[in-house]
Amino acid sequence: MKAIKAKSPHAALPVGARLVCADNTGARELQIIAVKGYKGVRRRLPNAGIGDMVVCSVKEGTPDMRKEVVNAVIVRQRKEYRRPDGTRVKFEDNAAVIVTPDGAPRGSEIRGPVAKEAAERWPRIGSIASIIV
């Protein structure tokens, strides 16, 4: 895992946000229940942005995946963020990829585009991504 190069708004996805699962593990919808490494302020909901690892509950998917608690990395977010060259990037949906605790993807393919920041921070996600934006 490497440092992220863009100013990602970490207020994009608070705890409780629902995400599309962008891989082929059998999960379809995830809900954020915690953000790994978040050091916050009292009574403030932990927030996550692109490239952050989150702990999620599988809300929709195959019967063996449902109700499972998994680690995931956020690869797309609807809230726009700014890159160092001045461009602003935003996606159509909020999406994550289910990973193992050390950051290896559990699925073998990723549907849809992946943000460049997430692919740089998690090289194993970048290696199986079909489109990197």
Curated annotation (Swiss-Prot):
Into which family does the record put it? Answer: Belongs to the universal ribosomal protein uL14 family.
Biological role stated in the UniProt entry: Binds to 23S rRNA. Forms part of two intersubunit bridges in the 70S ribosome.
Which cellular component terms (GO) are annotated to the entry?
A: cytosolic large ribosomal subunit
Give the range the annotation lists for the signal sequence.
Answer: none
Q: Specify whether Nuclease is a keyword of the entry.
A: no
Q: What does the record list as coiled-coil region(s)?
A: none
Q: Superkingdom of the source?
A: Archaea
Q: Which GO terms describe its molecular function?
A: large ribosomal subunit rRNA binding; structural constituent of ribosome
Q: Which GO terms describe its biological process?
A: translation
Q: Which UniProt keywords apply?
A: Ribonucleoprotein, Ribosomal protein, RNA-binding, rRNA-binding
Q: What is this protein called?
A: Large ribosomal subunit protein uL14
Q: How does it assemble?
A: Part of the 50S ribosomal subunit. Forms a cluster with proteins L3 and L24e, part of which may contact the 16S rRNA in 2 intersubunit bridges.
